[in-house]
Structures are given as structure tokens and as C-alpha cells.
């Protein structure tokens, strides 16, 4: 059994409650940290003829987000320039996207990805769905606050002007971050009632009562919904994912599928998205970068474990096969080594 699997099985036996948030992270706080020393090394790396990308990558992918904020502050104090602006000039392409992503706080990163998804003509629904379906109440509330700060407008307002119909209703309901998070009581009566109502509102009737689906799936707690989807199978000939495919289409179908997969197993959901970003010809780098940057300090160890379990090869191996150069080096550091 590989070390990642050993760690994970030990952690799942002990339960998550007593663990520090970084227990499943692949990027952790650097123990011998000195922001001024890092800022000086970055300044030298940026000024070097041809730019020393390796130093930039090694520093920024081996520090926690909090430490990266300290480095940016020290760099500005030292050079009177913003680190992100200096790196934007020094780097390009996918590597630039990774490094600039790492310099933002998690909520700044999510807010900027959401804004970019809704800017200009057309909407990148895929990004909108991934972020809004997978973040916790606390994360969503923080994203809303930071979005307001950065763009002087409400996230909800932008979602409303950029989407329509039931898809809009689902996105707005999720973005509020009002899901019940009390998991202390298991209400079997309500589990049964919700399962039956999901069935009655969809597969059982002609047409779909989408507002009913939205209410249940955006308001109930994750552990409650996991049990609801299990119970649902005793009413419906199809499981929840199959029912969604039969009942709704387009962006709404995609959003409900993403949401249910996130509720059932968030780390498997991200493993699937990573696999989809690299399978076949070409790479969907935006998705690959966003997940690697946003999950490396959250649950990347669990994602790697789910990835290997489902696809037979490690995430590290896939990244090695699918990317190259300094971009590859940065992603592999975020991945945290071979399983």
C-alpha cells in the first residue's frame, strides 16, 4: 500500500474532526520560512537574464497561501512594486496562470475565476458550475464578500444578468451559501420525505418540478442529501444522476449532475474533472490549473487517492504525460509527488 493510501486509511479511521485543515493538503506551510529572504530570491530570479523560473516555482509552490501573502508584502516593501505585476511581466502562458493563481487568496482566486467566466460575450458555465457547486457555505460567503470588494458589484447580480431560467435560479440559490450545516441529528423521516418528493417532482410525473429539486438540493446538509440519494433508489427505478439526465437538459442538467456528484463524493468529483481535463487529445488547461491551485491546500491527498483508485494510474503520472517544462514542474509540485 502506498504512503498516500496508508495516510488516508489512517485518517479516515480516526475521523476528520480532530485533524488540522492541512491534513489532506499537498502544499503546507514551510517550516523554515523567511518572507524577506524569499522576496529577495524572487527579485533576483525575476531580474535574471531570461528569468529564473525554477527558483520562482520552487519558492511559490512550497509555501502556504498565508506565507505567499507575506512574501508579496515583503516584496512590495523591498522593491516598491507588486509581486503579481512583476511576475506577470516575467512569465507567460500556463505557468503564469499557475503562479498568479497561487498569489491570490483562495477567495480572491475563486472570485476572479467567476468574474472571468461571466465577462464579455457568452458565459463559461462550466467554471461557474464547478466553483459554485463545490464550495462550502463559509467559502461562498467569503467569495461573495471578496467579489463585492474587488468588482464593486454583487456576485448574485452578475449571475442574474449572465444566466437565465431554472439554471439561474439554481446558481443564485447555491451562491447564497445558505445550506444547512447542522449534521448532529439524522432525521430519517425527513430523509424519506425528501427522497419521495424528489421522485414525485421528477421521474414520477410528466415534466419536472425544478423549484422543488432546487429547494431540497440547495438547502439540506451534505450528509443528509447523501442519505436522501440512497433512499431515493427505493422509490425510483433510476438513481439520482440517471434521473437528472432523463428530466432536464443543457446547463441545468450539467449543474445538477455536478452538484449531486459533489454531494456524493467531492474528491471523486474533482478527480473526474482532472481526468476529463487530460484525457484524449489536448488538455483543458484552465480546468487543470484551477483545480490544482484551489485544492492543493484543501484536499489534494484525497483527490489523488480517488484518482488512482478509479483510473488505475496516479494523477502525478497523468500530469507528467500531459504537460511539459516549467508548467509541468509547477503542477507536479502542487500534486505533491508520486503516489
Swiss-Prot record:
Residues 2-24 are annotated as: S100A10-binding site. The modification Phosphothreonine is found at residue 26. The modification N-acetylserine is found at residue 2. SMART domains: ANX. GO terms for cellular component: basement membrane; calcium channel complex; collagen-containing extracellular matrix; cytoplasm; extracellular region; nucleus; plasma membrane; protein-containing complex. Its main location: secreted. It is found in: Secreted, Extracellular space, Extracellular matrix, Basement membrane. The modification Phosphotyrosine is found at residue 24. It comes from the Eukaryota. One of its GO terms (biological process) is positive regulation of plasminogen activation. Annexin repeats lie at residues 33-104, 105-176, 189-261, 265-336. One of its GO terms (molecular function) is phospholipase inhibitor activity. The keyword Phosphoprotein applies. InterPro entries: Annexin (IPR001464), Annexin_repeat (IPR018502), Annexin_repeat_CS (IPR018252), Annexin_sf (IPR037104), ANX2 (IPR002389). Calcium-regulated membrane-binding protein whose affinity for calcium is greatly enhanced by anionic phospholipids. It binds two calcium ions with high affinity. Heterotetramer containing 2 light chains of S100A10/p11 and 2 heavy chains of ANXA2/p36. It may cross-link plasma membrane phospholipids with actin and the cytoskeleton and be involved with exocytosis. A pair of annexin repeats may form one binding site for calcium and phospholipid. Belongs to the annexin family. This is Annexin A2. It comes from Gallus gallus.
Amino acid at each position: 500500500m502506498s504512503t498516500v493510501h496508508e495516510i488516508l486509511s489512517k485518517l479516515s479511521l480516526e475521523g476528520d474532526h480532530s485533524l488540522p485543515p492541512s491534513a489532506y493538503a499537498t502544499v503546507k506551510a514551510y517550516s523554515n520560512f523567511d518572507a524577506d529572504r524569499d522576496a529577495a530570491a524572487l527579485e533576483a530570479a525575476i531580474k535574471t537574464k531570461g528569468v529564473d523560473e525554477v527558483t520562482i516555482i520552487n519558492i511559490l509552490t512550497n509555501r502556504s497561501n498565508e506565507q505567499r501573502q507575506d512574501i508579496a508584502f515583503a516584496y512590495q516593501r523591498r522593491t516598491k512594486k507588486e509581486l503579481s505585476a512583476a511576475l506577470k511581466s516575467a512569465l507567460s502562458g500556463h505557468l503564469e496562470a499557475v503562479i498568479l493563481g497561487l498569489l491570490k487568496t483562495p477567495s480572491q482566486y475563486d472570485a476572479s475565476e467567476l468574474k472571468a467566466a461571466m465577462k464579455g460575450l457568452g458565459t463559461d458555465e462550466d467554471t461557474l458550475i464547478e466553483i459554485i457547486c463545490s464550495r462550502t457555505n463559509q467559502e461562498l460567503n467569503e467569495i461573495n464578500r471578496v467579489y463585492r470588494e474587488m468588482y464593486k458589484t454583487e456576485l448574485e447580480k452578475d449571475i442574474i444578468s449572465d444566466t437565465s431560467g431554472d439554471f439561474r435560479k439554481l446558481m443564485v440559490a447555491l451562491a447564497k451559501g445558505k445550506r444547512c450545516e447542522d449534521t448532529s441529528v439524522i432525521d430519517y423521516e425527513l430523509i424519506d420525505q425528501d427522497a419521495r418528493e424528489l421522485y414525485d417532482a421528477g421521474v414520477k410525473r410528466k415534466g419536472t418540478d425544478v423549484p422543488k429539486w432546487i429547494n431540497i438540493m440547495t438547502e439540506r446538509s451534505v450528509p443528509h442529501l447523501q442519505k436522501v440519494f440512497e433512499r431515493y433508489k427505493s422509490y425510483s427505478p433510476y438513481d439520482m444522476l440517471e434521473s437528472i439526465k432523463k428530466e432536464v437538459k443543457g446547463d441545468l442538467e450539467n449543474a445538477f449532475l455536478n452538484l449531486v456528484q459533489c454531494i456524493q463524493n467531492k474528491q471523486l468529483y474533482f478527480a473526474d474533472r482532472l481526468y476529463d481535463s487530460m484525457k484524449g487529445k489536448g488538455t483543458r488547461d484552465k480546468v487543470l490549473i484551477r483545480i490544482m491551485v484551489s485544492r492543493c491546500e484543501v484536499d489534494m491527498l484525497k483527490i489523488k487517492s480517488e484518482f488512482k483508485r478509479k483510473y488505475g494510474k496516479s494523477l502525478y503520472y497523468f500530469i507528467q504525460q500531459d504537460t511539459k517544462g516549467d508548467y509541468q514542474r509547477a503542477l507536479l509540485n502542487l500534486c505533491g509527488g508520486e503516489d
